[in-house]
Amino acid sequence: MDIFRVLTRGASINKKANQKGKTVDYSTADTDNDKVDNKQVEKQLNRELDFFRNKKIVSKVETAKAKLEDSVEDSHQQDNNDDVTEVAYDVKITTKEQASALRKSYKGNITGEDIPLPIGSFEDLISRFSLDKRLLNNLIENHFTEPTPIQCEAIPLCLNGRDLLACAPTGSGKTLAFLIPLLQQIIEEKNFSGVKGLIISPTKELATQIFNECVKLSKRIYLDKKRPLQVAILSKSLGAKLRNKVISDKKYDLIISTPLRLIDVVKNEALDLSNVKHLIFDEADKLFDKTFIEQTDDILNSCTDPSMRKSMFSATIPSSVEETANSIMNDPVRVIIGHKEAANTNIEQKLIFCGNEEGKLIAIRQLVQQGEFKPPIIIFLESIARAKALYHELMYDRINVDVIHAERTAIQREKIIERFKTGELWCLICTDVLARGIDFKGVNLVINYDVPTTAQAYVHRIGRTGRGGRSGKAVTLYTKLDSVAIKPIINVMKQSGCEVEGWMNNISKITKREKEAIKKGKSHKERDQISTVPKVERLKRKKKQDMIRASKRRQLESNAIESAD
């Protein structure tokens, strides 16, 4: 927009008149042209002042929008009203035809009974659900101006009190999709004391991230004159305070926790979950697998309110999780954005054959030489021992790298994540502890040094890049041992619309026996050690270490015999 034009509008200079030496009365400038300019400038200002600018949906919705704008503009001209904030540019979904067109635009598949209409913009929440103004202001301050597809569907469903099973790609805004309705419902239930909302996350890092987002959205929201909306993450220190009655559990309205810590506090009768009205499982496929299912079941048994609303969110929803959801939910609605086993379409996916383990290190170094190793970068491995080994190899290559895994303390992990987020650290090596939910802004490259054991693990790993509409790249290194394990990866690549090479189309379908082997981690033999030292040299070193240990053992035995004599 030309700012100088705005500042000088209303002034018109007749150059020919000046050349003839005649004076010009600027007060009699061309009013018709000025009106046209003013009209164009006003329309531009209106659009720039509209915080809730909407995406292009389909021609029917756009036509309705254009008619609405024209009618509003005509009425403003007739009434000579200069209040630009009254001009509405939002797309309101009022019919099933509009809803169908919107869902078709983002490939949404919604199944269930009595499904409410989606929202076309955040302004829809004001007219349909009387969204709290303080919550709306917090959305604007944090630059959340346009709902993503999962938010368009999940928010009205939750605000209508429906149980929900939601699946959407990584980085698509699932956290906001359950936080907005949850906070709105807590505000509406301000007369009830105690914990009203509960969010369960499989890892502490993800729980912390959800807590930080929740704090931003609940800023300056008071349930009465002196009591702000209280959000807490159930840390070790908070658990101790609750057990020792230093703090009452009635203080908090919303608690975010990992399963085991929550169960520990509940079993000690330090936290009452009987009043919880909204229960949300983030990364539901992980929380309902064999690792967490018993803990999740204990949590469900502790939440005794029969009217409690339950929601499950994840980027991947296996059929087993769907069966569990249908058994514990009341008339749930199933929302799938895209394909439930597909990765984010903004991610360029690539497979690199390395022959053997030594070839993987060579491939990493080739990426560096070819300029494809562009930070920030995350490298995933299958075990802590292998993550440590790769860290030492890359550290000696003078790459700005660090490693994070379950053996690191909570403080160490937090510091490493903070360094990575601020750009101080370029490359982060980790296990699957960081594969889920953690939102790192602007990750350019994800490297699967070890092939993931399942398609779900692969989708979550590469989902650390390509978030928030940005593009990203994912590279998976594989060897002869991974000939079976890469089959699910190739299927994900096809479903995500990636270009695949000819041999990928000709690969045989994965058998039931191979699926079971992959799930049990038996799809390949034990991997070789990560090292650039030749195998012959490693065997020599091992033989030498064995000789030293044997010598020490003989020395101890002889000392024991002498002391006995």
Curated annotation (Swiss-Prot):
It holds the Pfam family Helicase_C. Keywords: ATP-binding, Helicase, Hydrolase, Nucleotide-binding, Nucleus, Ribosome biogenesis, RNA-binding, rRNA processing. A motif (DEAD box) lies at residues 282-285. Its EC number is 3.6.4.13. Its main location: nucleus. GO terms for biological process: endonucleolytic cleavage in 5'-ETS of tricistronic rRNA transcript (SSU-rRNA, 5.8S rRNA, LSU-rRNA); endonucleolytic cleavage in ITS1 to separate SSU-rRNA from 5.8S rRNA and LSU-rRNA from tricistronic rRNA transcript (SSU-rRNA, 5.8S rRNA, LSU-rRNA); endonucleolytic cleavage to generate mature 5'-end of SSU-rRNA from (SSU-rRNA, 5.8S rRNA, LSU-rRNA); snoRNA localization. Interacts with the U3 snoRNA and is associated with the 90S and 40S pre-ribosomes. This is ATP-dependent RNA helicase ROK1.
